Each structure stands twice: as structure tokens, then as C-alpha cells.
């Protein structure tokens, strides 16, 4: 298994932007912005939420929202406000909002097969 990184741009509510190299993490629910990035684009916490680390350790982090732009598209997404030393992560909520899925074999992002459901006659 390899790691997949993707370059993106994040924008805060006042229009400030920052470039970010995201680690695509299909095990992370929300995307995460390092402290230096979310402070640069002037994000503020909307709520505090509990998360579990990969080893099962519970932590609490602030959550906000920002505009995320990738080569495949852009959207508004919730983001965890990381602390010093945290790495930028692109989580599955952002991927799903953008209609993207990570192919685990090629380690590339591809358009998601979008199913609307059945149609009634």
C-alpha cells in the first residue's frame, strides 16, 4: 500500500486562500487542516466534536467549514481544525461531496458511481 497526496486550495469565509498538500485518507471521516493553514484563512470553530485516533484514543477537536478546491472540482466541506504538528488530511466526507472515490490499487481519485435510487412507474 502506498500513500496518495493531492494538491488543493482552501478558502475561508473572508476570501483568504492557502495551498495545501492533502494526504488522501479513506479512513478519516472529515478532512483536517493544520493549525497554520486554518489560521491563515481565518477559520473559526463552529462546534467541538469527539473523534477516535487510529489507536482508539479519544480526542476532541474544533470543527469548521471551508471551500476546498482540487483538480477534480471544488465544494464547501466541514474540516477539523488541527493542532500544531497535524498533517493535512482529505477525508471521505469531502471526497463524497466532490463525488470522488479513491481507487486503492492505482492510488488515484476517480469519479464516484452516483446512484439515485429506483424510479417508480
Positions of predicted regions on the chain:
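Pepsin/retropepsin-fold aspartyl endopeptidases
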Residues: 1-121
Amino acid at each position: 500500500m502506498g500513500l496518495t497526496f493531492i494538491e488543493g486550495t482552501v478558502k475561508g469565509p473572508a476570501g483568504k486562500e492557502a495551498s495545501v498538500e492533502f494526504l488522501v485518507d479513506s479512513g478519516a471521516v472529515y478532512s483536517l487542516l493544520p493549525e497554520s493553514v486554518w489560521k491563515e484563512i481565518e477559520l473559526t470553530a463552529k462546534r467541538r466534536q469527539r473523534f477516535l485516533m487510529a489507536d482508539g484514543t479519544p480526542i476532541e477537536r474544533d470543527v469548521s467549514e471551508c471551500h476546498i478546491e482540487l483538480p477534480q472540482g471544488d465544494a464547501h466541506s466541514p474540516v477539523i481544525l488541527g493542532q500544531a504538528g497535524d498533517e493535512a488530511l482529505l477525508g471521505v466526507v469531502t471526497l463524497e461531496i466532490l463525488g470522488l472515490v479513491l481507487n486503492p490499487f492505482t492510488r488515484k481519485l476517480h469519479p464516484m458511481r452516483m446512484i439515485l435510487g429506483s424510479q417508480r412507474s
